[in-house]
Amino acid sequence: MSGQNQGNCEETYSTSTHEYANADSTDWFADMFADFEPQNTTDGSYRGTMAKIKATELQYQAVFEQKLVEANTNLKRERIRVSIKQTGNSLQLRATLPLKPGDGSLGKTKKQYDLSLGIPANLEGLKTAIEESYELGKLIARHTFEWNEKYLGIKSREKQEIKTIGELLDKFEEKYYQTRQKTITSQNTFPNYISVIKRNFPLTHLATKENFEEIINSVQGNKKNELIAVTSVFIKTFNLGFQLDVKRDNVTPAHREIPEDDKIIYSFDLFEKFALNRKNTNISDEIDTWEMWRWVYGMLATFGLRPRELFVQPDINWWMSPQNLDHTWKVNKNTKTGYREVIPFVPEWIELFDLKNPKPLKILEKKVTKIASVQNINWMRRDISRWFRKVGIEFQPYDLRHACAIRAHLQGIPIKAAADNLGHTVDEHTKTYQRWFGIENRKKAFGEVISQKSLIELQKNEILALRMENERLRLEVEKLKFSTTKNPEDCEQLYHQG
């Protein structure tokens, strides 16, 4: 290569390396999910959540593969004699280099090698691989390449020193969002991951399979299952190279009394009773707040919504629109299971609970405009439970949702329609109403079936009686016809006399 050409080549390498080295790493991830809308495969169940995670991972992998192709195309176009290849969970640099020390290939002075530098196969790793490709290309162009610890893989092995859980935790959020959308849902989920790890694992312990499993196996039930789920995400995020060898516990949900309709209606009035009997408050924002929480209660009871589905960008304009003839509530796409339009399970409660009253809706709108983060939404969600306790309601907010699932079953609403309305899969919906289907609801179901059978029997008897009456009348008509045919003169005489 001439000195002039070599100089141009070096200038190309220098500029490109500088561009990649100084590029903000967030640029690599900013548009990854710009047009990505995963199908609403999650209903909050483990299977549904995993389906959505899988869809997101496939999107990430597609973007990664596209960027890898682009990187190799750019390297080739700029005549850099290095390419990048993926092997398992790592990226390697492929180049034709002088023979490695100890390589006895006869009759050769050069050979194609795949260099392992300890670079992970993700977008951040690809950025590093591109930088290393330009650096290696520069050495090849200058004929100054030498086999050293870095290219022999010695340093990469040293780099694989196991870090503590605390060291990884400091980088957890950054790594987590490199492969996931930053949505309201994910921002709500992630702080819980951090909290679970901090509460349960000594941060000074090494992030090894044995250390994780020792803690997980020391607890039972829901806590164990939560640790398995969170730790699995943690391990996968950092590609620690192992999987947990622990089994989830089978947990039987605690018994819950799902409220009957009369109790739901009675409890609605507890909000106003509380407001009338409470001590005076000088905080103007809190004087009428009870009306908004009563409205929230009514909506949960009527529609079977998740509490968050009332607070995440509520479409109040649609709710109050004259065009909303079916009184549906539109759940925002940024909620747990995505967009859906919900039909009221008990339409008459819209009027009974005065759910179209603009006053509580204005309070809600004012509250929602103050929401600056996911944390604010969580505060509002927790406030519902606090208000239930404050006014003396004896059940939990989610029990109203379970009541809708049971009610739909008793009403004979097709399972698929009810599941879609609640944002469930059919399986999850069936589990829900079967789990909380108590003795009173069984009595009601039996009573309705028996009542329907009694009604059918009554209708059958009525039909039989009508048929017998019809037969009697038919015979009377036939008898009359017969007597008329037998004595026509008598009939004529009777006619003239009349």
Curated annotation (Swiss-Prot):
It comes from the Bacteria. The active site is at residues 306, 336, 401, 424, 433. The keyword Mitochondrion does not apply. InterPro entries: DNA_brk_join_enz (IPR011010), Integrase-like_cat_sf (IPR013762), Integrase_catalytic (IPR002104). The keyword ATP-binding does not apply. Keywords: DNA excision, DNA recombination, Heterocyst. GO terms for biological process: DNA integration; DNA recombination; DNA repair; heterocyst development. GO terms for molecular function: DNA binding. Residues 263-446 form the Tyr recombinase domain. SUPFAM superfamilies: DNA breaking-rejoining enzymes. Essential for DNA excision. Site specific recombinase necessary for the excision of the 10.5 kb hupL element during heterocyst differentiation. This is Excisase C. It comes from Nostoc sp. (strain PCC 7120 / SAG 25.82 / UTEX 2576). The gene is xisC.
